[in-house]
Amino acid sequence: MRGAAPTVADLNLELNDLVLPANLLSEEVLQSSDDEYEITEEESVVPFRIDTCCYRCEVAVRITLYAAELGLRTLEQLLVEGKLTFCCTACARSLNRNGR
């Protein structure tokens, strides 16, 4: 706007050059969704053990897995929210007829 008494004609509505497309700073690069789940050399896979109980019969269940940090955080979130539970091999056999 210019002048002591601004008017509608003084407004500059061409703001496209002032807006960053995705809040990228310091030459950051957007990754496609396919690249998000690839494990890079920098992101190492580590062993992780979970001791819990069966959802159905409450017998002790121990699971060892290998995952990257992002995978472990996602798993932890699912477990804490109750969206993921484990079952023992005996319950799995009786429920799923040996996986068939």
UniProtKB/Swiss-Prot annotation:
It comes from Human papillomavirus 4. A zinc finger (unnamed) spans 54-91. InterPro entries: Papilloma_E7. Highly phosphorylated. Belongs to the papillomaviridae E7 protein family. Homodimer. Homooligomer. Interacts with host RB1; this interaction induces dissociation of RB1-E2F1 complex thereby disrupting RB1 activity. Interacts with host EP300; this interaction represses EP300 transcriptional activity. Interacts with protein E2; this interaction inhibits E7 oncogenic activity. Interacts with host TMEM173/STING; this interaction impairs the ability of TMEM173/STING to sense cytosolic DNA and promote the production of type I interferon (IFN-alpha and IFN-beta). Keywords: Activator, DNA-binding, Early protein, G1/S host cell cycle checkpoint dysregulation by virus, Host cytoplasm, Host nucleus, Host-virus interaction, Inhibition of host innate immune response by virus, Inhibition of host interferon signaling pathway by virus, Interferon antiviral system evasion, Metal-binding, Modulation of host cell cycle by virus, Oncogene, Transcription, Transcription regulation, Viral immunoevasion, Zinc, Zinc-finger. A motif (Nuclear export signal) lies at residues 72-80. SUPFAM superfamilies: E7 C-terminal domain-like (SSF161234). It is found in: Host cytoplasm; Host nucleus. Residues 1-42 are annotated as: E7 terminal domain. One of its GO terms (molecular function) is protein domain specific binding. It comes from the Viruses. GO terms for biological process: DNA-templated transcription; symbiont-mediated perturbation of host cell cycle G1/S transition checkpoint; symbiont-mediated suppression of host innate immune response; symbiont-mediated suppression of host type I interferon-mediated signaling pathway. This is Protein E7. The keyword Metal-binding applies. Plays a role in viral genome replication by driving entry of quiescent cells into the cell cycle. Stimulation of progression from G1 to S phase allows the virus to efficiently use the cellular DNA replicating machinery to achieve viral genome replication. E7 protein has both transforming and trans-activating activities. Induces the disassembly of the E2F1 transcription factor from RB1, with subsequent transcriptional activation of E2F1-regulated S-phase genes. Interferes with host histone deacetylation mediated by HDAC1 and HDAC2, leading to transcription activation. The E7 terminal domain is an intrinsically disordered domain, whose flexibility and conformational transitions confer target adaptability to the oncoprotein. It allows adaptation to a variety of protein targets and exposes the PEST degradation sequence that regulates its turnover in the cell. The keyword Zinc-finger applies.
